[in-house]
């Protein structure tokens, strides 16, 4: 379980990234965070694995306040927290398989990974992860030879290989076209259901949030302004979250692939 207790974050320049956040996320949930650019979505999600560090409050994960973590405890937190980025965050010159095996770094250690001394179980897990996102045929292609959608599937496979307890996806479809966006979200939802991995996704597109989320958290100016099940969300809810009427560019569009 993840719980924010009166969490605030002030950047060195004085900007408030988070303001008095009180949110509890239960194990196995699929939560979508929505809000305009600058609303605090990325700050919220990156605080969970301490890519940014809140300055006030407590952030409780599995009954421990992670804001006190350093050294080995912080490394262990990041090992059980898989991260998916908008820009894929792959090693472009390495092949797909090496990128996916990198998901085992937290379990294997730097020296063994440098010399590609992965256990047979790790190699088998990487193969399985590639098959689960239907990208195994590109296993020996360099990452920079792939399309954006293919690269994002590789990043999902890498996270699967990490075997995390939590998946954090920071605007994972922002750079993709509508059909590919739906494909990526479908994989994330499928993994959430099959593996019971708590999944938190930042999205701008409200139609995708409605289609894939179990629960929606709305943010504006660093504050949570809505938190509830998707069944309670309407267009007026999004207008309240965004502080304006809904525009065409707030919708991703495109049909979900069958």
UniProtKB/Swiss-Prot annotation:
The organism sits in which domain of life? Bacteria
Q: State the annotated membrane topology for this chain.
A: Peripheral membrane protein
Task: State the InterPro entries in the record.
Answer: AAA+_ATPase, ABC_transporter-like_ATP-bd, ABC_transporter-like_CS, ABC_transpr_PhnC, MetN_ABC_transporter-like, P-loop_NTPase
Report the principal subcellular site. Answer: membrane
Q: Where is the ABC transporter domain?
A: 2-246
Q: Where in the cell is it found?
A: Cell membrane
On assembly, the entry states: The complex is composed of two ATP-binding proteins (PhnC), two transmembrane proteins (PhnE) and a solute-binding protein (PhnD).
Give the family this protein belongs to, as stated in its UniProt record.
Belongs to the ABC transporter superfamily. Phosphonates importer (TC 3.A.1.9.1) family.
- What is the name listed in the Swiss-Prot or TrEMBL entry for this protein? Phosphonates import ATP-binding protein PhnC 1
Q: What is the lineage of its organism?
A: Bacteria, Bacillati, Bacillota, Bacilli, Bacillales
